[in-house]
Amino acid sequence: MFSCKKTDSYPDNNEKLLRILDDKIKNKKYYEIKKKNHIQKLKKEALLYKNNDSISYHLNNLIVEEYLGYQCDSAYIYSDKNKEIANRSNNEIWLYKNLLQRSVLLSTTGLFVESKEILDKINPEVLPKQLRFSYNSAYECLYSNLLDYSGGDSPYNKIYKNKLADYYNSAYKALKPGDPFYYLFLSHKNRIENNWSQAEQNVNKFLKTTLPGTRLHAIGSFCKAVIDAKLGNIDSQESCLIYSAISDIESSTKENRSMQDLAS
């Protein structure tokens, strides 16, 4: 198990971690097969329960989440199935959940206009309370991807950053302290406000709740690497980028931003 945490000898530790990363890269196919087998298992379960809307919706939702960051085109198929189930069942919560998940899929694949159209049609005042975080998180995903796509010189950067600050603030407030995502989004908010020391404390709290080898651990480790860079902790930054890259490979996540930063 590999986790982004402090060590007394970063240079030596980083050399070991890079060797582990090289080994993971060589065995990338193994993790992809493991991922595919897990998705196939979920698909078989979904077929078994195709006449049970509740279980079928839940399994389709899991399949979409597994495909997210891995093979988004396939995720749309199961998103469509859940839209059909939600409409047939006249289940408002399922329909909202499907719309929010769909918006994230769209913004992740660069379809920003379509993603925003979905979110703009949702009235947050009538949204079920348990979906408030997902709503703000979907907007955060949209503006975060827009910010990355636009690049550092875009005249829209300030607008996107202001929007991000709003949705970071709304997202963490929709959760209770103790929820893992509370600390992740509070850390994002700290970063926007240039409160980097507090951002580090909160992302560390989030990382403690994630399992190495998962997409969430990769995200948390990458966020910590960004914070370490701002704080001047260069060796720790490299460690966290390596941990993030390892978790990306083990979870078969295709985004690989940490790998790109390590190569630059």
Residue spans of the language-model regions?
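A "functional boundary" signal
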Residues: 1-264
